[in-house]
């Protein structure tokens, strides 16, 4: 979740994955570079190793998503949700290894009688512990689940309760290019509060899922301001990025599909040119595996179509790299 373009579990007063964009041919400085010619000699071994060790892209998952045809997940849910709205399953923990309870009453709000969608976030915090600390603050906001970098899933709020994890809604018809002429004119006024209010009055399916009817899933991951980046391309058509942050960190992104790479270049530009705009680190393989399992189970439990699962920046105005590398299909 983001504030001023950066995700934050501690402050979400105006709590966006960019919609899937067409894939223009990148040009100029942002064009992908061959793996054999990194621009900085000191990083050549790192970039070469990234290309050599690259795992194949997630084409199989994309095919599975197409086969699913946006329908509700089939089969029975394994979650076994109790009367408190807590999941009783060995893969979903209610305590940390140190014995700390993860259900955080201070982020729970009113009763949530119906679940219509899932929203995927990144925390902009370095650990489970720091996220739980923020959830313990007075007036804290947060999501229902938290997935650590090693793939461990924690439940942090009752599934019977709303949490403030979405923020102001973006116009769904604007992103799907289906607005009426009147609504197109209203959206051009750039009034996020008014836009969100109009959206909230629409029926399910005509608007994005909101705080009132969605489950939030957070992935532990930091966001950093980009200073520069290099790219390599793999034989399978995927891309690797090496981003240098303004505080000297090196962030690696491996096996990004062509469309994600295009969007990542856009996010890097934004981070370089705008204050308080950062790029989120790549979601880990373990997190994505757990995310796929959890979203499948939740979709089965609540009969949620695949078309109602979104990364946070799609539904609200957030940094576009938040959950950009998340894989739930």
Regions picked out by a protein language model, each given a short descriptive name:
Residues 80-303:
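Active-site-adjacent loop/helix surface patches within enzyme catalytic domains
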Residues 317-329:
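Short, low-complexity, polybasic intrinsically disordered segments
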